[in-house]
């Protein structure tokens, strides 16, 4: 498993950047006029992603960075605290509440600030000081921990991911999945691949 993880895991800094991109893309689906059930799904998807991201940084990445830039690491812990507070506040509200949109936008402001700070200061420092090998090792640790954190929420994550897409996108995705399944089934038949390549 370690050998396979080391081949498929991104470096720690790449993984963090990917998490940032995922959070921003998820939040981009949130609009004031979005139906309440979709707003809730977007927020829950974002909340889980941010929770996993924060745990990975706090348990693995920040301890490795503490000796390099302890003040910046402490600032990031504080930003995580603010994100967690806003997520809990959102979970206590209904999407139809006026405060829901305001709180969601405040969460996004904190996330954007956090992303900007990490990607312009902390991550470049990590790449410069820790080096490629250590970042790869941290990436493997973070991948292993991510799998542990996400596994209990796989069903919830899948349902909320589908709910966050507009109906047309979900329909197209469904049709593509069915098409992929049918193609795979055809290709696994003894004559399937030969018929396609003949």
Model-derived regions: residue spans:
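Small-residue-biased structural context
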Residues: 1-198
């Amino acid at each position: 498993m370690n050998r396979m993880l080391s081949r498929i895991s991104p470096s720690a800094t790449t993984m963090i950047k990917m998490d940032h991109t995922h959070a921003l893309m998820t939040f981009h689906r949130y609009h004031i006029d979005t139906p309440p059930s979709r707003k809730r799904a977007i927020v829950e998807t974002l909340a889980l992603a941010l929770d996993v991201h924060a745990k990975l940084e706090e348990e693995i990445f920040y301890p490795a960075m503490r000796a390099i830039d302890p003040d910046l690491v402490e600032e990031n812990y504080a930003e995580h605290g603010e994100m967690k507070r806003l997520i809990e506040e959102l979970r206590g509200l209904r999407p139809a509440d006026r405060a829901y949109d305001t709180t969601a936008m405040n969460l996004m402001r904190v996330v954007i600030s956090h992303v900007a700070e990490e990607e312009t200061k902390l991550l470049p420092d990590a790449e410069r000081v820790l080096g490629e090998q250590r970042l790869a090792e941290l990436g493997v640790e973070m991948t292993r921990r991510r799998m542990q954190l996400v596994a209990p929420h796989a069903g919830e994550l899948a349902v909320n991911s589908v709910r966050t897409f507009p109906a047309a996108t979900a329909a197209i995705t469904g049709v593509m999945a069915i098409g992929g399944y049918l193609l795979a089934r055809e290709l696994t038949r003894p004559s399937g691949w030969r018929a396609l390549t003949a």
